[in-house]
Regions:
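C-terminal scaffold of the Radical SAM
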Residues: 2-10, 30-54, 61-328
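Short active-site neighborhood of thiol/selenol oxidoreductases, capturing the structured segment around
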Residues: 12-15
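Local cysteine-cluster metal-coordination motifs and their immediate loop/turn environment
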Residues: 17-30
């Protein structure tokens, strides 16, 4: 890759819509599928990458690549390597030595060999979807890993040489208390070495998800396992103060980083930087044009990525309104 220093910063998002089992709260475009489907999807994804008109990116520098899902670590590591080879070759003129390249991983789905392949492919940042250090809470929201699974994956990551590791956490989970939330934060901050970055999100019960239906059914029977708004707010404020005491600084609503370890990709969104997306349901926001791919995996594999959907031309007023909103 060329070490470029372009004036315009660009982000890239790559969507891998597969997982071993969909979590109860997830409303993202994702599904469990066979390796046959995985391979066909990866082939279509690489076709989309290679079909992008890279000539229109003159003057840009690719500052970040984020491989999300789904669970990207649920597909063969060789597929991830193929994707990164396509990115580095097709976008060679805008890739730089300091490009941040992140892959989302589910604890328990990574091996030492997978991590070696990721590093060889140029990936330099991992994001683990832990959510909780309490096994009963993980089971309640349909996560397939345990706290011990996470600790093993975290150890393997550092043994493989990854020094930039994010840990995703969630609060206001069913049956979660302030005490168990405090325990999760304490256990994560006690890891050696500490994560360079922690994200803490309040659970949102998205309509149409199994967890939302379950909670609604329980509430109809007079059972409410969710925290009230005051407790939710208290959990958030506790995370802010506790993580500050552990050396993290908050640079965005849900993100906390050690000094100089902020996520470039996260900052790009909050600073309204341009980005391009590849994969099913992936969106692009470049210039005055915003568009996305189909949400249908089969249609995407069949070549629907060639015809973008929901195309929107933004005015200067639209961009100013968005900038003000994101800055609130």
């Amino acid at each position: 890759m060329m070490n470029t220093d372009k004036n315009k910063q660009l982000g890239m998002y790559i969507h891998i819509p597969f997982c071993i089992r969909k979590c109860k709260y997830c409303d993202f475009v994702s599904e469990a599928a066979s390796d046959f489907v995985h391979e066909n999807y990866i082939n279509a994804l690489i076709d989309e990458i290679n079909g992008y008109d890279a000539g229109q990116l003159e003057g840009y520098g690719l500052r970040s690549v984020f491989i999300g899902g789904g669970t990207p670590s649920a597909v063969k590591a060789e597929y991830i390597s193929r994707i990164m080879t396509a990115v580095k070759e097709h976008f060679a003129d805008i890739c730089g030595h300091f490009t941040e390249i992140t892959i989302e991983c589910n604890p328990g789905t990574v091996t030492a060999e997978n991590l070696r392949i990721y590093r060889d492919a140029g990936i330099n940042r991992l994001s683990f979807g832990l959510q909780s250090a309490i096994d009963s809470e993980l089971e309640c929201i349909g996560r397939i890993h345990t706290w011990d699974d996470f600790k093993n994956s975290y150890r393997l990551a550092h043994e493989a040489g990854f020094k930039n590791v994010n840990v995703d956490l969630m609060f206001d989970l069913p049956d979660q208390t302030m005490d168990t939330w405090k325990r999760t934060l304490a256990d994560v901050c006690a890891l050696e070495p500490k994560p360079s970055h922690i994200s803490a999100y309040s659970l949102i019960l998205e309509e149409g998800t199994p967890l939302a239906a379950q909670i609604e059914s329980e509430r109809e029977r007079g059972i409410d396992r969710m925290a009230d708004e005051d407790t939710d707010r208290a959990m958030y404020h506790y995370a802010q103060s506790y993580l500050a005491g552990e050396g993290y600084h908050q640079y965005e609503i849900s993100n906390f980083a050690m000094p100089s370890m902020e996520s470039i990709h996260n900052l790009s969104y909050w600073e309204c930087k341009e980005y391009i997306g590849f994969g099913v349901a992936a969106a692009s926001n470049k210039g005055d044009l915003r568009c996305r791919n189909t949400y249908d995996i089969d249609r995407y594999i069949a070549g629907a990525w060639q015809n973008k959907e929901d195309i929107e031309h933004l005015t200067g007023r639209d961009r100013m309104s968005e900038f003000v909103f994101l800055g609130l």
